[in-house]
């Protein structure tokens, strides 16, 4: 592939060279401007910022004036359609004003970049900078120790504290950093090697884009970097009167956090930006909002956020009522027993396989070997045996033989097992023998799901009364629900015991199960495995099993960052994923040349047969390198391997530091020491990324930092990150990867070819192979994994895009309700849509009586047309007349409500004994009641109109939030059930899109009807004593924030199979699904989603079935 790329470069040219060449004229302009700026005084240099802001303001002044005039104009417009037109004009003008701002920023870019470079230069060359004190200087001096006021002057020091460490400014931007800054401003990804100063590069586009006053966000992967970088770079911006803050320094939903977002430049972690967005979209008052519009974001380590985190959405959830009902503790002893029995069985198969293979009987030996592998693939003895000559090849040959013809022969292998593990797909399945063992000491059908269709047919043949039939069916559905949940719990426990290992996939800290990020080796604080798996691991580890939760709000980081008008990113390793970043995010990757040439030596991989040989060789190499005075950084892929190597080094009396998920708080300190002579540091999966390892002159003379990789990662990019720790800024260094046939990557994807070559060469234990051909073979295996992962991520994003478009609609409606500006327009549209639904439904059946009934029921109005007109008029004409009548009634009702409420409000307001600021007013529609909080003074001054407006806002928010919560649950259920379409040769994504649209339309229709019905029927209290003081505007709810793991398509489909059912996968959380209001004794029709069978029974009996999710209500 590299050969083809080289040929293409000859004919087409090198993309990175072309990109850099296109930017060179801008760099030349910056260099020209530097000389003129160096002659300016400090005050004149600072005045440039005010000058730039004025240019931007004047460029967009015409558009801004028009926008302000239209906003004033719209307040006086009563006609809803005219209002909608004005709001559309405002939106267009705002877009045009943004484009003018961007054009102006491009024009002032060279001078603005030159200003920041000159500022950096002056801070480096002067211990103190004395300027005329401004109001901003005086404000900052109260909290910043590096600014001192002396009379009318402000003295800025060039030393300050960043993340607890005293630093003296010593950096000036290189030309390559100016190129990186231009790339970031253009909304692209700047790939710069480690040590090339990405943090300093960001100061250029941050300053330029902050000049608009719309806010700029710098996003980091952890809070240490966010706090450190914001403190480290702040004086550079504050010197020019720009405010800098970090959201991670302040509590969520606080005034301080809102102030941080109001700053010109805001630093923070990706998670906190995302969670703040979700919290804002659960707020019930504009005062609770913290974020502004999403203007421009620069994402540090952009590959980590947009690629590694692609399967982890941010979730805000709340506890489920009865959500703690699980059988993990009860079923755990059974699973432990089953796993122990299978372990003995697997060891027996392995012993037998070894004997048969030794005797030359490879056919039967291969059969027993395959059994041992499908019983326990992570068995250490099995992994060691597979590294021996020819054994891995025999296993794969046998597996291919039994998997041929759609796994036709595989049951012969599995019949002796109690459960089967397919490690590649992360799946475990109980066999009949396993169910038999599990069912000991229980009834025979303890783990067997009843066949609903057959059982219902049997009950109906029993000549029972309707009541008795209903009771029998109710028992059947309860039995089905309990058992399907039990089987799911069982499967998750089995996974916890066989596929998830402590100190590899997770660690135990403070008696809690904490997930370890496989990409970075850091703890994913607050993240839980979904679907009961986390609870299963908690049961396995004997810690408290946390309650099940229900999703209230969710967003993927990818879709959050796509909301920004402009997005850019920085990383040292993106070029291997350039195709994915362009295809999914339309982000171009530009490779920035290094300031100095690279002198690191990257050696070919050393390949061993077994892990033991590999680790022994690693330790020997580390001892030699350390004794020669070179610092050594050992990269591992898990906490377990880190601790193993640590024990081996202790045995050799080699002092060392360990940096992994358990020690992430000491990260920066350990990384800083990693460049000292002879220091050995073990780091799990690039923990410590983002902190420089600086080398002394002594270390450089000895050969620089030595990187030792103990295993190849699934992704070439992560290996490049590890290599990139050495050789920064032209420093010497070396990198060497050690690989064994027992490593995960080799075991699952790449070892057959390598094993054959090693067998052919007759390599004995302890001998090693090192050749460029072998390294390329390993990289091909990595590429295969990357392609699989890309496919999965792209597919997941396509699913999330469906949810994202729905989220935008719902959150837009929430925002309108929250701010109130466009709420009247939304209510008018809801009113029209409700009228349209009522007309269409009844016009289709020609049912005038029901049309009249629905108008009274939902809108409290009588029909505006006669029966003859109803039959004669078209749907559009009828909807128009109905809407006009409803609108007139609603306007009159609002005037009446305000008029009736005002005397009560006046009495409360004018009562000298009351000092209320806010009051609670209860509203009711006869069924539900809602407490509306309103500002007493505003309600009094508007003569009751403010109360009506608050009523509209509160009811809209309450109903939208409730409907959205239920909709999220339904979407989750549907995403799992549509995967079964693959069995019918249909694309699940297309079905998901179609069904999601139907679900969403139904939800919106439901919201419209419910909101309008309450607004039309909601009555004010007639008594003053119903009104109370609102001491707290809103009770803060106990939400849980987490990052969750999205499963790929195969895993979801397997889940359905595990539970022994095909349409509905039962999750441990039991949420009551949304249904129309029906009396319990009403007769309803329901349909089985699996076989289409229709039943007619009383709603109280049907409700259990509907809750189980295997049946749906059939609308008449």
UniProtKB/Swiss-Prot annotation:
Its annotated compartments are: Cell inner membrane; Cytoplasm
Top class in the EC scheme: translocase
Give membrane topology per the record.
Answer: Peripheral membrane protein
A GO MF annotation of the entry reads: protein-exporting ATPase activity
**BP GO annotations:** intracellular protein transmembrane transport; protein import; protein targeting; protein transport by the Sec complex
State the Pfam families in the record. P-loop_SecA, SecA_DEAD, SecA_PP_bind, SecA_SW
- Known EC number: 7.4.2.8
Oligomeric state and partners? Monomer and homodimer. Part of the essential Sec protein translocation apparatus which comprises SecA, SecYEG and auxiliary proteins SecDF. Other proteins may also be involved.
Annotated HAMAP family: SecA
What does the record give as the function of this protein? Part of the Sec protein translocase complex. Interacts with the SecYEG preprotein conducting channel. Has a central role in coupling the hydrolysis of ATP to the transfer of proteins into and across the cell membrane, serving as an ATP-driven molecular motor driving the stepwise translocation of polypeptide chains across the membrane.
What name does UniProt use for this protein?
Protein translocase subunit SecA
Question: Which species is this record about?
Answer: Flavobacterium psychrophilum (strain ATCC 49511 / DSM 21280 / CIP 103535 / JIP02/86)
Per the UniProt record, the lineage of the source organism begins with:
Bacteria, Pseudomonadati, Bacteroidota, Flavobacteriia, Flavobacteriales
């Amino acid at each position: 592939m590299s050969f083809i790329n080289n040929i293409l470069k000859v004919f087409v040219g090198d993309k990175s060279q072309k990109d850099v060449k296109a930017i060179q004229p801008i760099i030349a302009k910056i260099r020209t401007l530097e000389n003129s700026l160096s002659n300016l005084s400090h005050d004149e240099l600072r005045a440039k910022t005010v000058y730039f802001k004025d240019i931007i303001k004047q460029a967009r002044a015409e558009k801004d004036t028009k926008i302000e005039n239209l906003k004033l104009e719209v307040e006086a417009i009563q006609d809803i359609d005219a209002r909608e037109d004005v709001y559309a004009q405002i939106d267009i003008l705002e877009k045009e004003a943004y484009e003018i701002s961007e054009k102006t920023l491009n024009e002032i870019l060279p001078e603005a970049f030159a200003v920041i470079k000159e500022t950096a230069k002056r801070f480096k060359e002067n211990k103190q900078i004395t300027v005329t004190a401004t109001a901003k200087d005086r404000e900052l001096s109260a909290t910043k120790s590096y600014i001192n006021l002396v009379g009318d002057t402000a003295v800025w020091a060039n030393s300050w504290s960043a993340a607890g460490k005293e630093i003296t400014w010593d950096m000036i931007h290189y030309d390559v950093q100016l190129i990186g800054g231009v790339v970031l401003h253009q909304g692209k990804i700047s790939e710069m090697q480690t040590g090339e100063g990405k943090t300093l590069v960001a100061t250029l586009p941050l300053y330029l884009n902050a000049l608009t006053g719309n806010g700029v966000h710098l996003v980091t992967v952890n809070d240490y970097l966010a706090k450190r970088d914001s403190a480290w770079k702040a004086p550079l911006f504050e010197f020019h009167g720009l405010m800098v803050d970090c959201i991670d320094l302040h509590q969520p939903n606080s005034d301080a956090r809102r102030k941080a977002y109001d700053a010109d430049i805001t630093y923070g972690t990706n998670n906190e930006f995302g969670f703040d967005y979700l919290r804002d979209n659960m707020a019930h008052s504009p005062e609770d909002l913290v974020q502004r519009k999403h203007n421009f974001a620069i994402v540090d380590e952009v590959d980590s956020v947009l690629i590694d985190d692609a399967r982890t959405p941010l979730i805000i959830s709340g506890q489920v009522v009865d959500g703690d009902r699980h059988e993990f503790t009860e079923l755990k002893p059974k699973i432990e027993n089953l796993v122990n029995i299978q372990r003995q069985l697997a060891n027996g198969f392995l012993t037998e396989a070894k004997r048969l293979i030794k005797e030359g009987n490879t056919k039967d030996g291969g059969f027993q070997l395959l059994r041992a592998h499908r019983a326990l693939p992570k068995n250490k003895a099995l992994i060691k045996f597979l590294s021996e000559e020819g054994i891995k090849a025999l296993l794969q040959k046998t597996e291919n033989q039994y998997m041929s013809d759609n796994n036709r022969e595989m049951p012969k292998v599995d019949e002796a097992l109690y459960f089967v593990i397919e490690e590649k797909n992360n799946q475990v399945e109980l066999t009949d023998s396993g169910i038999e063992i599990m069912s000991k000491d229980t009834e025979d059908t303890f783990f067997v799901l009843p066949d609903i269709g057959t059982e219902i047919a049997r009950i109906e043949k029993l000549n029972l009364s309707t009541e008795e039939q209903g009771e029998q069916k109710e028992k059947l559905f309860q039995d089905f629900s309990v058992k399907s949940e039990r089987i799911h719990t069982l499967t998750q426990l089995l996974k916890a015991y066989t596929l998830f290992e402590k100190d590899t996939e997770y660690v135990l800290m403070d008696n809690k199960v904490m997930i370890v990020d496989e990409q970075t080796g850091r703890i994913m604080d607050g993240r839980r495995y979904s679907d009961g798996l986390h609870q299963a691991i908690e049961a396995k580890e004997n810690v408290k099993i946390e309650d099940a939760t229900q999703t209230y709000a969710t967003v993927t980081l990818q879709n959050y960052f796509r909301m920004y008008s402009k997005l850019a990113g920085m990383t040292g390793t993106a070029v291997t994923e350039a195709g994915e970043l362009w295809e999914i995010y339309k982000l171009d990757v530009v490779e920035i040349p290094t300031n100095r040439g690279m002198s690191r030596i990257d050696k070919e991989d050393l390949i061993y047969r077994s892990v033991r040989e590999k680790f022994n060789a690693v330790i020997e190499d580390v001892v030699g390198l350390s004794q020669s005075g070179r610092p050594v950084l050992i990269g591992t892929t898990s906490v377990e391997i880190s601790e193993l190597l640590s024990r081996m080094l202790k045995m050799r009396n080699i002092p060392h530091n360990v940096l992994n998920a358990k020690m992430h708080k000491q990260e920066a300190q350990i990384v800083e020491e990693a460049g000292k002579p002879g220091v050995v540091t073990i780091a799990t999966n690039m923990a410590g990324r983002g902190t420089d390892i600086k080398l002394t002159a002594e270390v450089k003379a000895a050969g620089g930092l030595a990187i030792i990789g103990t295993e190849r990662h699934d992704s070439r990019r992560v290996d490049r990150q590890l290599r990139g720790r050495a050789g920064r800024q032209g420093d010497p260094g070396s990198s060497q990867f050690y690989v064994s046939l027992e490593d995960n990557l080799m075991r699952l994807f790449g070892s057959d070819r390598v094993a054959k070559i090693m067998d052919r060469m007759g390599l004995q234990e302890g001998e090693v192979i090192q050749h460029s051909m072998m390294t390329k073979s390993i990289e091909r295996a990595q590429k295969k994994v990357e392609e699989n992962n890309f496919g999965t991520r792209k597919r997941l994003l396509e699913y999330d895009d469906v949810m994202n478009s729905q989220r935008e609609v719902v959150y837009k409606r929430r925002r309108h309700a929250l701010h109130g500006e466009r709420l009247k327009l939304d209510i008018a549209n809801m009113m029209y849509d409700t009228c349209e639904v009522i007309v269409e439904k009844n016009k289709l059946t020609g049912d005038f009586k029901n049309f009249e009934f629905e108008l009274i029921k939902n809108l409290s109005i009588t029909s505006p047309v006669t029966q003859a007109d109803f039959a004669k008029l078209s749907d559009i004409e009828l909807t128009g007349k109905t809407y006009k009548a409803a609108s007139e009634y609603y306007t009159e009702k609002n005037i009446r409500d305000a008029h009736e409420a005002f005397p009560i409000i006046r009495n409360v307001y004018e009562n000298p004994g009351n000092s209320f600021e806010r009051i609670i007013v209860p509203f009711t529609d006869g069924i539900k009641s809602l407490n509306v909080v309103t500002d007493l003074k505003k309600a009094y001054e508007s003569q009751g109109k403010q109360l009506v407006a608050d009523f509209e806002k509160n009811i809209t928010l309450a109903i939208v939030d409730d409907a959205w919560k239920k909709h999220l649950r339904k979407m989750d259920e549907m995403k799992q059930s549509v995967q079964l379409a693959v069995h019918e040769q249909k694309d699940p994504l297309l079905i998901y899109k179609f069904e999601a649209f139907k679900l969403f339309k139904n939800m919106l229709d439901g919201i419209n009807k419910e909101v309008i019905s309450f607004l039309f029927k909601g009555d004010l209290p007639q008594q003053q004593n119903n009104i109370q003081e609102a001491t707290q505007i809103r009770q803060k709810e106990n939400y849980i924030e987490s990052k969750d793991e999205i499963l790929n398509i195969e895993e979801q489909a397997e889940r359905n199979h595990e539970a022994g059912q095909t349409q509905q996968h039962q999750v441990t959380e039991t949420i009551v699904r949304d249904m129309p209001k029906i009396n319990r004794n009403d007769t309803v029709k329901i349909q089985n989603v699996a076989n289409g069978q229709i039943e007619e029974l009383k709603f109280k009996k049907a409700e259990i079935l509907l809750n189980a999710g295997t049946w749906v209500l059939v609308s008449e």
